[in-house]
UniProtKB/Swiss-Prot annotation:
Physiological role: Required for spatial organization of the terminus region of the chromosome (Ter macrodomain) during the cell cycle. Prevents early segregation of duplicated Ter macrodomains during cell division. Binds specifically to matS, which is a 13 bp signature motif repeated within the Ter macrodomain.
Molecular functions (GO terms): sequence-specific DNA binding
Gene Ontology CC terms, in alphabetical order: cytoplasm
Protein name: Macrodomain Ter protein
Location of this chain's protein in the cell: Cytoplasm
InterPro entries, per the entry: Arc_rbn_hlx_hlx (IPR013321), MatP (IPR009390), MatP_C (IPR035375), MatP_N (IPR035087), MatP_N_sf (IPR038339)
Cross-referenced HAMAP family: MatP
Protein's UniProt keywords contain Transcription: no
Sequence similarity: Belongs to the MatP family.
């Protein structure tokens, strides 16, 4: 699915991504010499409030091996950004124990669906089973009343 690209917003994301990588101690520039790398990073840090100039910095200074990772990160961020706008596409997160996730994953694979679809299916099956059980209990009570009279 294609999402609209918003240059200013995405340049800000790219700047943030690069700064976070730099703070984590990763090499973000293509330079081997540390003084050149430090100079390039200081230039990048000055661009915080000029997001569109980040693209120019990326073309001039960014390490080649970071290009693919940056594009993937921005694509994922764009998807999350646009999905968060609508309640039905907004993602929620839940914590599962590993064994619970494993059982759910196995069941989802058996059903040939996603984890979310499997949860939805299992909940509807449980509800249906509960209703059937209540109906059987009511029938048993009615039958026992008829037989005791």
């Amino acid at each position: 699915m294609k999402y609209q690209q918003l240059e200013n917003l995405e340049c800000g994301w790219k700047w943030q991504y690069l700064i976070n990588k730099w703070k984590d101690g990763e090499t973000i520039t293509k330079y081997i010499d540390s003084s050149e790398a430090d100079h390039a990073v200081s230039e990048l840090r000055k661009l915080e409030h000029e997001p569109t100039k980040v693209l120019e910095w990326i073309d001039l200074h960014m390490a080649e091996e970071l290009d693919k990772k940056l594009k993937q990160a921005i694509r994922a961020k764009r998807k999350r950004h646009f999905n968060a706008e609508q309640i039905h596409t907004k993602k929620k997160s839940i914590d599962l124990d590993y064994r619970v996730w494993e059982k759910l994953s196995t069941r989802a694979n058996e059903l040939g669906c996603t984890l979310s679809d499997a949860i939805e299916y299992l909940l509807s099956e449980a509800s249906r089973s509960e209703k059937a059980s209540a109906a059987v209990s009511t029938l048993k009570e009615d039958l026992s009343k008829l037989l005791s009279d």
